[in-house]
From Swiss-Prot:
EC code: 5.4.2.10
Listed name of the protein: Phosphoglucosamine mutase
PROSITE patterns in the record: PGM_PMM
NCBIfam families, sorted: glmM, PRK10887.1
Active-site residues, Swiss-Prot/TrEMBL: S104 (phosphoserine intermediate)
InterPro entries given in the database record: A-D-PHexomutase_a/b/a-I, A-D-PHexomutase_a/b/a-I/II/III, A-D-PHexomutase_a/b/a-II, A-D-PHexomutase_a/b/a-III, A-D-PHexomutase_C, A-D-PHexomutase_C_sf, A-D-PHexomutase_CS, Alpha-D-phosphohexomutase_SF
Catalysed transformations (reactions): alpha-D-glucosamine 1-phosphate = D-glucosamine 6-phosphate
A GO cellular-component term linked to this record: cytosol
Organism in which the protein naturally occurs: Corynebacterium glutamicum (strain R)
Residues forming coiled coils: none
Post-translational modification, as annotated: Activated by phosphorylation.
Length: 447
């Protein structure tokens, strides 16, 4: 049986794969698993539910809320708000669980559900497996009378609580910094511009008018050309691009050059080391982190640890080792002292704080590492499980690694959220990386 949970919750085409009946069952099962030990002395467990603006969000929120209420859980709806805000609010409200309804950077027709435990932590695999296990075994009857959970619509102070949290996390004045922010017509459309303005920056917001259908449509972190053009048009000091649920952030310098998550991590790691804030002088990245990040961290006397792709795995390593900075090339940056998950708005504030504190431009700060040419090709496949062990793929990888030697690397991995296999090649020059990646992708496509 195919596992329901992927690397970032449950995700699929809304109303076909991710249906209201499935959301109802998920809500009930998650409530049962996550709140079973909280029902003492008649106490009623509490859940926080947020969503991004896509059209199917209300439908799924209603179904999820009904499922949780059927298990005796009070549900507090916090409306359209970023994923990291739901994680924060789960802890801030003292709730027993949190739920975010979003498919992140995926197209509008998709949607997803991700759960947080008490304290705002993403769930480990074994807890997700337990939720799946009990989905079809819960009795149809639940609590009755006073035992039924309530649904509290749209908590009025949720956004203000989150904004105050961001202000406390990064108190540096950003006065004099001019920024373009692309909110992807998503969950950060209101919050991100407000947070940057509150810190003193001059903000030009684009793609910040969601209409339920335009989330991620030719905008946001997957269409970086939009913020690049806007930065050049407005003469801004930098641009920031968020994804649909605003747990990631990519940046653009004043000349329109992309600054990815690896470069952001490099500049923040060096700054935190200088300030004595980089615990154990260690940064946590993933297997997709550019080889240039490893080289830069070695030169700075910082240890780079790598995990599987997915900010949940970065988080697990951060928590297990007691480290203070981690993230992904895609722009998920995690600062455990200020949050339990990747937070695009917090990342944006941290980048600008570093600019304000040093007086340097983003382009200058990004020189903390040299990005080696990297080519990534997504190959549609029908069965991700057989690719890496197929003899023709094994032979093609060996041939590529022999050609690259110590000047590059090859990584093949299955997407955790889509029916894709990702082929990544780093090399001394772009053309070599492109040629080898194309060759490998052709082999994968034929399997």
């Amino acid at each position: 049986m195919t596992r329901l949970f992927g690397t970032d919750g449950v995700r699929g085409l809304a109303n076909e794969v991710l249906t209201a009946p499935l959301a109802l069952k998920l809500g009930a099962a998650a409530a049962h698993v996550l709140t079973a030990e909280k029902r003492v002395d008649g106490r009623r467990p509490v859940a926080i539910v947020g969503r991004d603006p896509r059209v199917s969000g209300e439908m799924l929120a209603a179904a999820l809320s009904a499922g949780m209420a059927s298990q005796g859980v009070d549900v507090i709806r916090v409306g359209v708000i970023p994923t990291p805000a739901v994680a924060f609010l789960t802890d801030d409200y003292g709730a027993d669980m949190g739920v975010m309804i979003s498919a992140s950077h995926n197209p509008m027709p998709d949607n997803g559900i991700k759960f947080f435990s008490a304290g705002g932590h993403k769930l480990p695999d074994h807890v997700e497996d337990e939720i799946e296990r009990v989905m079809d075994s819960l009795p149809a009857e639940g609590p009755t009378g006073h035992g039924v959970g309530r649904v509290i619509e749209e908590a009025t102070d949720a956004q203000d609580r989150y904004l105050e949290h961001l202000k406390e996390a990064v108190p540096t004045s950003l006065e004099g910094i001019k920024i373009v922010v692309d909110a992807a017509n998503g969950a950060a459309s209101v919050v991100a511009p407000k947070a940057y303005e509150a810190a003193g920056a001059t903000v030009i917001a684009i793609h910040n008018k969601p209409d339920s259908y335009n989330i991620n449509m030719d905008c946001g972190s997957t269409h970086i050309d939009q913020v690049q053009a806007a930065v050049l048009k407005h003469g801004a000091d930098l641009g920031l691009a968020h994804d649909g649920d605003a747990d990631r952030c990519l940046a653009v310098d004043k000349d329109g050059n992309l600054i990815d998550g690896d470069q952001i991590m490099a500049m923040l790691a060096i700054a935190m080391k200088e300030n004595g804030e980089l615990r154990k002088n260690t940064l946590v990245g993933t297997v997709m982190s550019n080889l240039g990040l490893k080289i830069a961290m070695d030169e700075a006397g910082i240890t780079l640890r790598t995990t599987k792709v997915g900010d949940r795995y970065v988080l697990e390593d951060l928590n297990a080792g007691g480290f203070s900075l981690g993230g992904e090339q895609s722009g998920h940056i995690v600062l455990p002292d200020h949050g339990t998950t990747g937070d695009g708005t917090l990342t944006g504030l941290s980048i600008m704080a570093r600019m304000a504190e040093t007086g340097k431009s983003l382009g200058e700060l990004a020189q903390a590492m040299t990005v080696l040419p990297q080519v990534l090709i997504n190959v549609p496949v029908s069965d991700k499980s057989t690719i890496v062990s197929h003899p023709s793929v094994v032979a093609a990888i060996a041939e590529a690694e022999a050609e690259l030697g110590s000047t590059g690397r090859v990584l093949l991995r299955a997407s955790g959220t889509e029916e894709l296999f990702r082929v990544m090649v780093e090399a001394g020059d772009k053309e070599q990386a492109r040629r080898i990646a194309g060759r490998l992708s052709a082999v994968v496509a034929e399997v």
